Each structure stands twice: as C-alpha cells, then as structure tokens.
Amino acid sequence: MITPALRHSGTLSFAIKLTVASTLLTFASLSAHAEEQPASPPQPPDILLGPLFNDVQSVKLFPDQKTFADAVPNSDPLMILADYRMQRNQSGFDLRHFVDVNFTLPKEGEKYVPPEGQSLREHIDGLWPVLTRTTESAGKWDSLLPLPEPYVVPGGRFREVYYWDSYFTMLGLAESDHWDKVADMVANFGYELDSWGHIPNGNRTYYLSRSQPPFFAFMVELLAQHEGDDALKKYLPQLQKEYAYWMEGVENLQPGEQNKRVVKLDDGTVLNRYWDDRDTPRPESWMEDITTAKSNPNRPATEIYRDLRSAAASGWDFSSRWMDDPNQLSTIRTTSIVPVDLNALLYKLEKMLARASKAAGDDANANQYEALASARQKGIETHLWNNQEGWYADYDLKSKKVRNQLTAATLFPLYVNAAAKDRASKVAAATQAHLLQPGGLSTTSVKSGQQWDAPNGWAPLQWVATEGLQNYGQDNVAMDVTWRFLTNVQHTYDREQKLVEKYDVSSTGTGGGGGEYPLQDGFGWTNGVTLKMLDLICPKEKPCDSVPATRPAAPGASQPAPQKQVETTP
C-alpha cells in the first residue's frame, strides 16, 4: 500500500506586503526540503507513442478517443514505436491488430442493474461501492496515476477520479455517513499535491498539465466537520501548496501582465485565470481538437489548443462563456478571460488558509491570508461586477472590462460569502428571471449546442446556487432551484432507473445533450447533490428517500402555494 506523502515539515508560507495604494502582493517562500519538491511528471501517451498515437487517433480506430489514451502498453513504448515504424509501410499491415497485440485496452465497466423498487436514496447508497476504485499501483507505462486510498469515480467513461467532481460526490458520501471514504479522498488529493505540486484534472498522465476548479479547501472544511480542527492542521501544508500553484509567478508580474494562472490588472489588482501548461491537442479528444483548430486557419493552432485545454481546466468544457462566437468553438479564448467563479473559489482558499493557520497557532500567517482574501474580494467587487446588468460576470483581458453574459457562475461570490448584500439580491433576481427553468438552473441562457450552455443544468451548479442563495436569505429562490432540479432527477430516475451527468432543465425528466461524448450515467456529483438536497427539503426527524409530491416551504420565507411535481410523458 502506498503511504500518503502528507509531510508537515518545511511547509510553504508567504510574506505579504499589502499597500493601501496598490494592494501589491509580494510573496516570499521559505526554503523547503529538497525531498518535498514535486517529482518529474511521467509522460502522457501522445509523447510516449508519438506518431503511433497520432495515427491511431487520426483514423478514429475507436469511437471514443479516450479509449486509446487509456490503453496500457504491454512493453516499453520505445520498442513498440520502433516496431511500428518498421511495420507500418509493409503490405497488409493491420493497425487494429498491431494495437491489439501491443496494448491492453480499457475494459468496459460491468453494466450495473439496480434492484427493482429502490427509492432514490436507496439507489444512490447502493451505487457507492459500485463507483469505488482502488489503484495502489499501475503499470510502468499506464496513463493511470496510482493513489494510496480508494476513491469514487463519476461513472460511465470516466474511469479515474476527477478533481472538482469529487467535492460534490463527497457531499453525498458524508450524507450517507461514509466519512471513511471522505477521509480517503482528501488523503488522495493531499498525496497529489505532495507528489505533483498541484491537483491534476484527474489521475491520468495526460491530465497533469492542468488542474480544475480549486475545491480542495472545501474538501478539508467538509472533513473538519467530522474531525474538527485536526483536519485543518493536518492539511495546512497541502492547502499552502495548492495556493502556491495558483499564484505561481505573481511576485514578478507588472501591471497588465499575466503568468500561467495569475494575472495582474492595470490597477495592480491580482486575480486568476485558467491555464494549461501544454498547447497541443488533448490526448483524450485528439481529433476533435485538431478538427476545431483547422476550422479557424486565422489563428495559430497552438493558441486554440491551449484555450481548449484551459476550458477543460475550468470544468466548463465547453461553453459560449469562453467563445467570441457561440456557434464556433474555434473562437474560444479561455486564457484571456478572468472567471468570476475561479476567483470566488480562491477567495475561499485564502479564507481557509487563514482559518487553518489560526488553528495551527500561526496568527501572523493567518492575518496575511486574511489580507489576501480582502484584496481579492475588493478585486471581485471592482472588476467582476457588471453594474449595468446587475450581476457578477467574467472580466475580459482583451477589452479590459467586465463581460455582459449572465451564467450560473454569477452565484459563486454568494456561495463563498464574498458578495455585497445588495448585489446578492440583484443576482437572485437575475437568476430567477433568466436562468431558473422548470427543471432547475440553466448553465447559461445561450443555446450553442455546447454542453455547458442552455438548456443543460449540472448538479454542482444547482448546489452552488442553492447554498449561495441561502447564505443571503434568498430562501424562496433557493428552494425553487432545489425543488425543480430534484423533480427533474426523480422523473428521470422513475423512467430510466439511473442518475445522469447533466439534465435538460427546460422540462423535467430528460438527460442533457451536447458535448464530445454520449450522456454518462452513474453519476458521482449528481448522486452527492441529490442526497444533500433530499436532506435539505425534508426535516431531519422525518427524512425522505424520494422527492415529496409537493414543494416544501422554504425555511424562514413567506411561502407561495405548494406546487405539485410537473407530470411528464414517459
């Protein structure tokens, strides 16, 4: 068994000077022990296999490009590549046969058939062991990265753990009283921070060049609900490493400059963006990316590839939010956009670093992190609020102004308690008027055909909206989001006996569409959010296993007439 590398010596701390005039941040790292430096990352399959990888993906040997990215070489990739170069031009060469001989392809997961007559809660509780994986070791050339403890995967084609998905899955594990699994998953992410200096998109070599929305602070906070301040002190070094990754290079930035994930605006405000260290097609979506880049010959392909990868880092892959033309994916420019949700999450990380530092008895660093959080909050209110529209939005580095598009990301400042109260009420009104649909919260109001646009609704965004609105006393709108999404989940489950990755919220009882792959079932984060919402709408003394027939009253709010579930045609 791998021992999690949760080392506590030589931890990272920051000295910060915060001037009132410019809020200039200066970071100085204390020297760290050499053994704590991240290891050299293993190479992804597109580099290991070079032309062989490109050829297999280019002829679309497999319907899903992720299949070959996850295939395991049976011997040294250099030897396989040498054999390929000798054989590929010979008469009668069969590429599929060559792949079958030299690689072990990922197995299709066994089709899970749930027992008949299960309630929604019973179905989810029965899925936890089905979705649990253990990978204490992996083959030398496997793209899968081993983790020390068991973990829960989303389901379907996703055979590995994913960063931001996992927090919402963990919410459900906690509701099911699987605190051991919650602790295991936090330990795994701590191990990744110690191993690689960041939490990758997922535990695959081809995901190491990027991260995902930074929810590690939320995970530690969740674990602390069960273990108390010991969890905060235990994972303080890893929280610091997470922060160092996102802020890398900030100390050398001049106003108007960017470095990887950090940007300094013209007025000296420091904020963050999504970034991938590579500018090549994604191995798991190789031909899709090449096709997208070829459709816009006016842009360098490498620029498009990095923006596609950076959108994958955002979790919103893909959305009109990142595009100049909602109907042309090749106009994507993720790296020139400062996302409101990312900066809200980093505000939370700074607040958690302050809390964990205080728990560890380090008041000086706690005060420094509080100052950083205050500076970021000011930056959010100054640059990520659209005063004309009345909602939080992203900042455009090219036009140097806040964007106009309303997306579900507008609720993240409410979710982390960073919003001004009067602005929170405006966000609630905009949400109700433009994003709230019969089946839940729409991701945007734009119908682009991309999966992170209308009419799709995603479980994590439903929870962010629900909790964010509750934080500011917008209980009726919060209950509307909860009730409508749960009704959607229940109707889909009643018809298909499964929970899915995303839902069409323009009605109830329909899975979502769009994206680079078919609709996936399972599904980790939907399971977790559904359990949280079930426990939100039903009193603790009388928990419900399925969605009640009528909408409950929002706590502490004047309540409209009870609404019955909307009937749908099977």
Swiss-Prot record:
Protein's job: Provides the cells with the ability to utilize trehalose at high osmolarity by splitting it into glucose molecules that can subsequently be taken up by the phosphotransferase-mediated uptake system.
UniProt record, GO biological process: cellular hyperosmotic response; trehalose catabolic process
Listed name of the protein: Periplasmic trehalase
Entry similarity comment: Belongs to the glycosyl hydrolase 37 family.
Binding positions (substrate): R157, W164, D165, N201, R210, S211, Q212, R282, P283, E284, G315, E516
Quaternary assembly: Monomer.
Gene3D superfamilies attached to this UniProt entry: 1.50.10.10
HAMAP family: Peripl_trehalase
EC number from the UniProt entry: 3.2.1.28
Alphabetical UniProt keywords: Glycosidase, Hydrolase, Periplasm, Signal
Catalytic activity reported: alpha,alpha-trehalose + H2O = alpha-D-glucose + beta-D-glucose
NCBIfam families: PRK13270.1 (NF009773), PRK13271.1 (NF009774)
Class of this enzyme: hydrolase
Localization in the cell: Periplasm
Extent of Low complexity compositional bias: 552-570
Molecular functions (GO terms): alpha,alpha-trehalase activity
Disordered: annotated segments: 542-570
Signal peptide from the UniProt entry: 1-34
GO CC terms of this entry: periplasmic space
Active site feature: D317, E501
